[in-house]
Amino acid sequence: MLRHILTAKNLLSNPIFKFPNCLPFLSTVCCICRQFVGENLCSFADSPSLFEMWFHFLQLRSALNISSALRQVVHGTRWHAKRKSYKVLFWREITPLAVPIFMENACVLLMGVLSTFLVSWLGKDAMAGVGLADSFNMVIMAFFAAIDLGTTVVVAFSLGKRDRRRARVATRQSLVIMTLFAVLLATLIHHFGEQIIDFVAGDATTEVKALALTYLELTVLSYPAAAITLIGSGALRGAGNTKIPLLINGSLNILNIIISGILIYGLFSWPGLGFVGAGLGLTISRYIGAVAILWVLAIGFNPALRISLKSYFKPLNFSIIWEVMGIGIPASVESVLFTSGRLLTQMFVAGMGTSVIAGNFIAFSIAALINLPGSALGSASTIITGRRLGVGQIAQAEIQLRHVFWLSTLGLTAIAWLTAPFAGVMASFYTQDPQVKHVVVILIWLNALFMPIWSASWVLPAGFKGARDARYAMWVSMLSMWGCRVVVGYVLGIMLGWGVVGVWMGMFADWAVRAVLFYWRMVTGRWLWKYPRPEPQKCEKKPVVSE
């Protein structure tokens, strides 16, 4: 036995037998040694053992052939040739921006989940009322976020050109205009709140409508604070400082949970305010966050964006305002129309019963958690693209957007497919109602099935907006939202009786149309139409003079 083992060792030490070519020999030698170690209980001539050994050898060889073929395919790709530069891009450009944004969004969503937990203990009607009111609040927040995006792009572009003054003016004027607009908007919505809830709630019960109206009237008071927090955070991100928004928004959401919990359920001998405490706690925490943003800008924590309180009363510069609005208005039209269409689909769901409303709300909350890395990469792509184009690096902007897109596609698909089997477990954190959990499980599995096209639908347009190509995204969103999500969702969900599954299939049809059109835009390079590439200089041949 020792002689055979030493022979095998000398054979494998030969430099000819390198990985993976040595593995079939190693497998054969191990099988032979196993025959001798058994104290001759099994003869080497035993035919079943020989057949089994040969079968395993063939399996190993076929697996090695497949792995070798895959390795050759990977080595022949463009990614493998530039893998070192992509690694540098990931760690130096993407990670410092995307990770704090991811943590900030995760904190916001997780605190939203905890807020839902706080309300869920008050009953299904309370949870459905919050869901209906928040579906309208999301329309307003989407508008603020779009102006925030315009501010982010202008700040990133201006600082790319080393123009700090323009970045400060853009931030200051965006804060002033959007705060005034938020006050006006809050007044109008508070006055017409009952009509808005009747329109949004559809066939919901009277109790659900009353709770939704109460929550809406309390949360509209926080609109000015939400506008200040969103736009100030966007300006800081455009300046490359993503840690301060993370700290402020994270602290804001933790305060929201603490304050709302105390106001809902009371403290010590005080019984609390019940359902009213949920909306009041959110409003108080948002104003604390707005004060923190204004303080950070006033003390100049980021030197590029030092804005004193007196400067908010200076005259407005309309040239910079129109530059911000040139990106913000198309993006806001896109966001408002998108969220309005989403609100309309919520109305389809509102007539399907309280269990379906609650299950749909929970499924959207879980899907938002799954999409967090993609949302962070989308925000990072906006900043990276704006910076690169600000210094005239057009080719780098194109390469980096492609890299972010594929990174998001592969990462989100893996996350969605790995978390889908645990949909029931995640739903149990929200509710113990079996009907609601059944709805959540079905919707999360559908979300995982269509996740490979999500990044093309959402990450790519975020990068396009960094190149100030916002109008194309606006028209595509209008077409896909109203032509697919609303129409297909109504046909499948209401007319054909598919229920909430049909409404979600309309959403996936919206994703598919957006993915095709945005991917075509990226491949053709038309999203860089505002940045013409310099034409290569032609070398003119000098005429030969004959003597």
UniProtKB/Swiss-Prot annotation:
Q: Main site of residence?
A: membrane
Q: Where in the cell is it found?
A: Cell inner membrane
Keywords from the named record:
Cell inner membrane, Cell membrane, FAD, Flavoprotein, FMN, Membrane, Peptide transport, Protein transport, Transmembrane, Transmembrane helix, Transport
Alphabetical GO CC annotations of the entry are:
membrane; plasma membrane
List the InterPro entries hit by this protein, alphabetically: MATE_fam (IPR002528), MATE_MdtK (IPR050222)
* Statement: the UniProt record of this protein carries the keyword Protein transport: yes
| Membrane protein topology class | Multi-pass membrane protein
GO molecular function: any one? antiporter activity
Protein's UniProt keywords contain Protein transport: yes
Q: Which domain of life is it from?
A: Bacteria
A GO BP entry is:
protein transport
What is the similarity comment for this entry?
Belongs to the multi antimicrobial extrusion (MATE) (TC 2.A.66.1) family.
Q: What function does the entry list?
A: A transporter able to export peptides and flavins. When overexpressed allows cells deleted for multiple peptidases (pepA, pepB, pepD and pepN) to grow in the presence of dipeptides Ala-Gln or Gly-Tyr which otherwise inhibit growth. Cells overexpressing this protein have decreased intracellular levels of Ala-Gln dipeptide, and in a system that produces the Ala-Gln dipeptide, overproduction of this protein increases its export.
Q: Name it.
A: Probable FMN/FAD exporter YeeO
> Which source organism does the UniProt entry give?
Escherichia coli (strain K12)
